Each structure stands twice: as structure tokens, then as C-alpha cells.
Amino acid sequence: MGSNVEFHDFSVKVMGEIDDRVNIVLEECAGELESQIKRNSRVDTGKTKNSFRHHVDDDAHVAYIGSPDENAIWEEFGTGEYAINGDGRKGGWVYYDEKGERHFTIGKKPSRAMWNAYSRMKNMIIRRIQDFMKGL
């Protein structure tokens, strides 16, 4: 009365499929978030807006979104008397723009392009990842 039981280990295949799907949905969501950040950005020359990029680390399953442009920090958090934490320079200062023109300012109001994009899209991204992973 013996029965033959045969065991097949598909764990490597399953884990590979999970890895692939995670990276696909991360790429999709990071791209959407990058696009929303760009739509939220103030535009003068377009340099800062166009500097935002995303990168997915396939091994770590992490998406990075940001800008190497120093102005992106100032746009996000503000400067001078408008700095988001109130810790900016007070009293104003003079600067020269790219055309060499002189300006006086008390700071730059924060645009919060990244924060607003994240706040707007967070729940949608969570739902998208959940729905995408259900298909396994």
C-alpha cells in the first residue's frame, strides 16, 4: 500500500518571477512619480525640472528619484525667510542670475514638487503594486 510522492522544487523559479515583477512595477511607479514631480516643478529655464531622474536598483528592489541640480533642494525646501523650517537667512541678499543681472531677494518660497507628488500619488502607487503582485 505504498504511495509514491514526488516533490518538485519550484522555489527558484517563483522567487525569480517575484523579483522580475517587483522590478517591473517599481520602474513603472518611479517613472510615474518622476513625471508628476516634473509637472509640479516651477519653470524658469527648465533646467531643474528636466534634471529629475529615477533609477531602480534591481538587486535591492529600491527606486530612487531625485535631481543632481542644487536648485532642486532650494525649490523643495525654500530659502531665506521662506525656508520651510524657518532656518533660512534673514534680511535678504543680492545675487546675479545666469544673464549677469543683479537681484535682491529675501528668499525663494518652497514649491514642494517632490513632497506634493509623493502625497498625491502614494495611495495610488501602493494600490498599483498590490494589484500588480496579485497576478502571481
Residue ranges and their predicted role:
Residues 1-72, 85-136:
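Short, Lys/Arg-rich flexible segments
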Residues 74-76:
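His/Glu-rich zincin catalytic helix
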Residues 79:
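Small/polar-residue-rich segments within soluble enzyme cores
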